[in-house]
Amino acid sequence: MFSIEPGNREGPPGSLTEPPRDIVVIGASRGGVEALKGIVAALPPSLQSALFIVLHISPTHVSLLPDVLSRAGPLPAEHGRDGTRVERGRIYVAPPDHHMTVGPIGFIRLDQGPKENHTRPAADPLFRSAASVYGSRVIGIILTGGGSDGTQGLIAIEQAGGLAIVQDPGDARDPSMPMSALLHDNPDLCLPLSEIPGVIIRLSSVSQAST
């Protein structure tokens, strides 16, 4: 696997080529496990992107989400560990009771800072850090869940030139998080869950070995 260096990777001046969208950050809560399984199951093993996932979970619960996602699709999933270099083709899951962010030199950072939106881990810290470090290369996705977590982070992603995607509230088990984003932001896309993997694949840098 190859690490993903920070910064924008724009095409040359005047180029019609967009930068690869190789950093995918996802926030979810109630109903999120099934939604996440549906996304990762549809991704190819050659996907040259890193996925970061925040699923709201009680600090006292044991998170089995990496195992669940590794079984659901071809990409290996693991809990994010402080100091781990970001690599392509991997899924990083925020561990219970820790915010997961991306540091300025492309390493994962974990902390137990104040809860945001009444939760830790929260999507907003992850989204903000990804926008700051990777800019227009980021795809931010808000899935089913209660509350408003992810809304402010999605705004930061758009302001940095990244792409904002929201699950269609009518398609979500709990529409609160998607509705919050739609009410307070202007996401680029509002899609049913089944269409989100295709967008990730089209906009991410995919290995030529798969073509």
Predicted regions and their residues:
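Strand-loop microenvironment adjacent to phosphate/nucleotide-handling motifs in alpha/beta enzyme folds
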Residues: 1-211
